[in-house]
Amino acid sequence: MKALLLTFGLSLLAALQAQAFPTTEENQDVSGTWYLKAAAWDKEIPDKKFGSVSVTPMKIKTLEGGNLQVKFTVLIAGRCKEMSTVLEKTDEPAKYTAYSGKQVLYIIPSSVEDHYIFYYEGKIHRHHFQIAKLVGRDPEINQEALEDFQSVVRAGGLNPDNIFIPKQSETCPLGSN
């Protein structure tokens, strides 16, 4: 469960083969506030594992050198926990790494304005994982963006039946219920 929680909470994103994704822009601006609208894993996750999961908006800040700092708070089993990580820019457009290269991610523009798909893979505690996440500038689910996300999930070899839509929360005071 810890590996699964860490995987979910970090929201870092990674790689499929480049031909499976749309062309990415060299200077895309992803700084600002983003809402996690949907996520899909390469493993089946029982509904009960995330039945009580709630997420706050992600804050992404562009750092010196093009790296990104990602922060948000997640409510799990009645407790709020702050998550934060730095995504290190690579020479390849829209490709980042985290945790000393153990996780690789791509930030892919959706065909729907103000939406991106974060796709990542890596290892946590010797367990390999792949995750795709749909994020947008507002908390409302956009059906067109969700359909685009489902197409990318399929193209990446993930099962669209494993898509999870988290509960949105504007705030989650640390340590609170």
UniProtKB/Swiss-Prot annotation:
Disulfide linkage: 80-172
Gene Ontology annotations of biological process type: sensory perception of taste
Function field: Could play a role in taste reception. Could be necessary for the concentration and delivery of sapid molecules in the gustatory system.
Record PANTHER family: LIPOCALIN, LIPOCALIN 1-LIKE PROTEIN 1-RELATED
Superkingdom field: Eukaryota
Leader peptide range in chain numbering: 1-18
GO molecular function: chloride ion binding; identical protein binding; signaling receptor binding; zinc ion binding
Recorded family membership: Belongs to the calycin superfamily. Lipocalin family.
Pfam families for this protein: Lipocalin
Assigned GO CC terms: extracellular space
Compartmental location: Secreted
Protein name: von Ebner gland protein 1
Organism: Rattus norvegicus
Subunit structure comment from the entry: Homodimer.
Keywords per UniProt: Disulfide bond, Secreted, Sensory transduction, Signal, Taste, Transport
